[in-house]
Protein backbone atom coordinates (compact mmCIF):
# COMPACT_ATOMS: atom_id res chain seq x y z
CA UNK A 1 0.00 0.00 0.00
CA UNK A 2 2.83 2.36 0.84
CA UNK A 3 4.32 2.04 -2.67
CA UNK A 4 0.91 2.88 -4.19
CA UNK A 5 0.71 6.06 -2.11
CA UNK A 6 4.23 7.05 -3.08
CA UNK A 7 3.44 6.53 -6.78
CA UNK A 8 0.15 8.43 -6.48
CA UNK A 9 1.91 11.29 -4.67
CA UNK A 10 4.64 11.41 -7.31
CA UNK A 11 2.07 11.51 -10.10
CA UNK A 12 0.14 14.23 -8.28
CA UNK A 13 3.20 16.46 -7.93
CA UNK A 14 4.24 15.77 -11.51
CA UNK A 15 0.83 16.91 -12.70
CA UNK A 16 1.07 20.06 -10.60
CA UNK A 17 4.16 21.08 -12.52
CA UNK A 18 2.48 20.50 -15.91
CA UNK A 19 0.54 23.41 -17.39
CA UNK A 20 -3.17 22.64 -17.68
CA UNK A 21 -3.44 24.18 -21.15
CA UNK A 22 -1.02 25.17 -23.87
CA UNK A 23 0.22 28.75 -23.64
CA UNK A 24 -1.16 29.63 -27.08
CA UNK A 25 -4.70 28.56 -26.18
CA UNK A 26 -7.43 31.18 -26.47
CA UNK A 27 -8.39 32.57 -23.07
CA UNK A 28 -11.70 34.05 -21.92
CA UNK A 29 -12.35 37.67 -22.83
CA UNK A 30 -13.24 40.14 -20.11
CA UNK A 31 -16.75 39.48 -18.85
CA UNK A 32 -16.94 35.97 -20.35
CA UNK A 33 -16.83 32.79 -18.31
CA UNK A 34 -15.42 30.62 -21.08
CA UNK A 35 -13.00 31.21 -23.91
CA UNK A 36 -14.49 31.63 -27.37
CA UNK A 37 -13.88 28.78 -29.76
CA UNK A 38 -11.20 29.33 -32.41
CA UNK A 39 -11.97 30.29 -36.00
CA UNK A 40 -9.93 30.27 -39.16
CA UNK A 41 -9.88 32.50 -42.23
CA UNK A 42 -12.53 30.41 -44.03
CA UNK A 43 -14.95 30.80 -41.11
CA UNK A 44 -14.32 34.51 -40.64
CA UNK A 45 -14.62 35.33 -44.35
CA UNK A 46 -17.72 33.18 -44.79
CA UNK A 47 -19.48 34.54 -41.72
CA UNK A 48 -18.87 38.11 -42.88
CA UNK A 49 -20.37 37.18 -46.27
CA UNK A 50 -23.45 35.66 -44.61
CA UNK A 51 -23.81 38.65 -42.30
CA UNK A 52 -23.59 41.02 -45.27
CA UNK A 53 -26.20 39.02 -47.20
CA UNK A 54 -28.57 39.19 -44.23
CA UNK A 55 -27.85 42.87 -43.72
CA UNK A 56 -28.48 43.70 -47.39
CA UNK A 57 -31.81 41.85 -47.46
CA UNK A 58 -32.98 42.65 -43.93
CA UNK A 59 -35.29 45.56 -44.72
CA UNK A 60 -36.83 43.77 -47.70
CA UNK A 61 -37.93 41.01 -45.34
CA UNK A 62 -39.03 43.24 -42.47
CA UNK A 63 -41.05 45.48 -44.80
CA UNK A 64 -42.46 42.42 -46.60
CA UNK A 65 -41.21 43.67 -49.96
CA UNK A 66 -38.98 40.77 -50.99
CA UNK A 67 -40.17 39.13 -54.23
CA UNK A 68 -40.40 35.31 -54.01
CA UNK A 69 -37.66 34.74 -56.61
CA UNK A 70 -35.34 37.11 -54.71
CA UNK A 71 -36.10 35.26 -51.47
CA UNK A 72 -35.15 31.96 -53.10
CA UNK A 73 -31.85 33.43 -54.36
CA UNK A 74 -31.14 34.91 -50.93
CA UNK A 75 -31.71 31.58 -49.18
CA UNK A 76 -29.62 29.75 -51.78
CA UNK A 77 -26.72 32.21 -51.40
CA UNK A 78 -26.73 31.79 -47.61
CA UNK A 79 -26.87 27.99 -47.94
CA UNK A 80 -24.00 27.93 -50.45
CA UNK A 81 -21.85 30.11 -48.19
CA UNK A 82 -22.64 27.98 -45.12
CA UNK A 83 -21.71 24.83 -47.05
CA UNK A 84 -18.51 26.52 -48.26
CA UNK A 85 -17.54 27.42 -44.69
CA UNK A 86 -18.03 23.84 -43.51
CA UNK A 87 -16.17 22.41 -46.51
CA UNK A 88 -13.13 24.69 -46.31
CA UNK A 89 -12.75 25.29 -42.59
CA UNK A 90 -10.03 23.52 -40.63
CA UNK A 91 -12.01 23.51 -37.38
CA UNK A 92 -12.53 20.25 -35.57
CA UNK A 93 -14.20 18.87 -32.49
CA UNK A 94 -16.43 21.14 -30.43
CA UNK A 95 -15.74 24.18 -32.61
CA UNK A 96 -16.89 22.39 -35.75
CA UNK A 97 -19.99 20.97 -34.06
CA UNK A 98 -21.04 24.35 -32.66
CA UNK A 99 -20.34 26.09 -35.96
CA UNK A 100 -22.41 23.50 -37.83
CA UNK A 101 -25.33 24.01 -35.41
CA UNK A 102 -25.10 27.79 -35.65
CA UNK A 103 -24.98 27.73 -39.45
CA UNK A 104 -27.95 25.35 -39.51
CA UNK A 105 -29.95 27.88 -37.48
CA UNK A 106 -29.04 30.66 -39.91
CA UNK A 107 -29.83 28.55 -42.98
CA UNK A 108 -33.12 27.34 -41.49
CA UNK A 109 -34.12 30.88 -40.57
CA UNK A 110 -33.31 32.31 -43.99
CA UNK A 111 -34.92 29.26 -45.60
CA UNK A 112 -38.17 30.30 -43.93
CA UNK A 113 -37.89 33.65 -45.72
CA UNK A 114 -37.89 31.78 -49.04
CA UNK A 115 -40.45 29.14 -48.09
CA UNK A 116 -42.86 30.52 -45.48
CA UNK A 117 -45.01 27.39 -45.74
CA UNK A 118 -42.33 25.45 -43.84
CA UNK A 119 -43.99 26.31 -40.51
CA UNK A 120 -41.92 29.39 -39.71
CA UNK A 121 -42.98 32.84 -40.92
CA UNK A 122 -40.42 34.91 -42.85
CA UNK A 123 -40.15 37.35 -39.94
CA UNK A 124 -39.62 34.55 -37.40
CA UNK A 125 -37.03 33.02 -39.71
CA UNK A 126 -35.18 36.31 -39.98
CA UNK A 127 -35.25 36.73 -36.20
CA UNK A 128 -33.85 33.21 -35.82
CA UNK A 129 -30.99 34.01 -38.21
CA UNK A 130 -30.35 37.38 -36.51
CA UNK A 131 -30.16 35.72 -33.09
CA UNK A 132 -27.70 33.11 -34.35
CA UNK A 133 -25.52 35.81 -35.93
CA UNK A 134 -25.65 37.85 -32.71
CA UNK A 135 -24.61 34.77 -30.71
CA UNK A 136 -21.71 33.93 -33.04
CA UNK A 137 -19.13 36.31 -31.44
CA UNK A 138 -20.03 35.03 -27.97
CA UNK A 139 -19.19 31.47 -28.98
CA UNK A 140 -16.39 32.06 -31.50
CA UNK A 141 -13.26 34.19 -31.62
CA UNK A 142 -13.83 36.67 -34.46
CA UNK A 143 -12.18 40.03 -33.72
CA UNK A 144 -14.16 43.03 -34.92
CA UNK A 145 -17.37 41.09 -35.55
CA UNK A 146 -20.61 43.06 -35.47
CA UNK A 147 -24.02 41.41 -35.88
CA UNK A 148 -26.19 42.24 -38.87
CA UNK A 149 -28.59 44.48 -36.97
CA UNK A 150 -25.94 46.75 -35.47
CA UNK A 151 -24.57 47.59 -38.92
CA UNK A 152 -27.70 49.35 -40.13
Predicted segments with their positions:
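Bacterial N-terminal signal peptides
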Residues: 8-16
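Immediate post-signal-peptide N-terminus of mature secreted/exported proteins
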Residues: 22-69, 148
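C-terminal amphipathic alpha-helix
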Residues: 33, 111-152
Amino acid sequence: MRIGRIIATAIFFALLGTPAAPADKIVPRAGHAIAPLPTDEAVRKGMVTIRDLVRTNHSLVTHRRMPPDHALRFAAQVKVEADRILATSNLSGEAQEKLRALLEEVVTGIGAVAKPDAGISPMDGLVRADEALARYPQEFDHPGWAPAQSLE
